[in-house]
């Protein structure tokens, strides 16, 4: 894991529009726990992280969002602009882990104190993401790119910090990847 990223202060995207998308790398070990339901829960699974729109973000099935540095590098090249760790709103920026091709239900062990996460779904791009990046047509561009990153639920709470090892410890007996679900939802709904 390259970085663990949190939004400690909400980004102001316009009148009455605040978001937790402005995530920055942390040098600290951060606690991770199941946040409960979207409505009335704790929001993010990463303690200290901000979720400002619980109708669409956070909760047990979107407790932690991961994105691969290799995919950020590809976007950096395509967009000809710097893409820093956390700028896509990810809590975890990985290296040498294929996030898009992980299986729904795949379990990751992170660090050494028992933190266990399970892949649940891809990110679907939204107006907040587009406004944050300030790229015209970003929702269509991101969707066409086909590398959405993955949301995870917390199976076993623990801590994580930059440099922790991510180990795939269980892969379900099916072939449904995060990328496949993304394509089915966004590109090939029939």
What are these regions (language model features)?
Residues 1-111, 115-128, 170-190:
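Electropositive, beta-rich accessory/interaction domains or terminal extensions
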Residues 105, 157, 161-164:
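Loop/turn positions that initiate beta-strands
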Residues 106-156:
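Glycine-rich active-site loops that engage anionic ligands at enzyme catalytic sites
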Residues 147-148, 164-166:
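A structural signal for small-residue-enriched, beta-sheet-centric alpha/beta enzyme cores
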């Amino acid at each position: 894991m390259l970085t663990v990223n949190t939004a400690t202060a909400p980004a102001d995207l316009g009148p009455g529009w605040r978001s937790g998308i402005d995530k920055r790398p942390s040098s600290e070990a951060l606690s991770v726990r199941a946040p409960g339901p979207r409505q009335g829960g704790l929001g993010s699974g990463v303690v200290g992280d901000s979720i400002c729109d619980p109708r669409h973000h956070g909760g047990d099935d979107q407790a932690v969002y991961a994105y691969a540095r290799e995919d950020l590098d590809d976007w950096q090249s395509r967009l000809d602009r710097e893409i820093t760790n956390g700028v896509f709103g990810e809590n975890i920026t990985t290296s040498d882990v294929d996030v898009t091709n992980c299986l729904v239900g795949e379990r990751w062990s992170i660090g050494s104190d028992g933190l266990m996460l399970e892949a649940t779904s891809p990110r679907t791009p939204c107006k907040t993401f587009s406004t944050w990046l300030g790229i015209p047509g970003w929702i269509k561009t991101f969707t066409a790119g086909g590398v959405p990153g993955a949301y995870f639920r917390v199976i076993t709470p623990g801590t994580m910090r930059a440099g922790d090892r991510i180990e795939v410890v269980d892969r379900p007996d099916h072939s449904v990847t995060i990328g496949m679900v993304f394509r089915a939802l966004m590109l090939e709904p029939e």
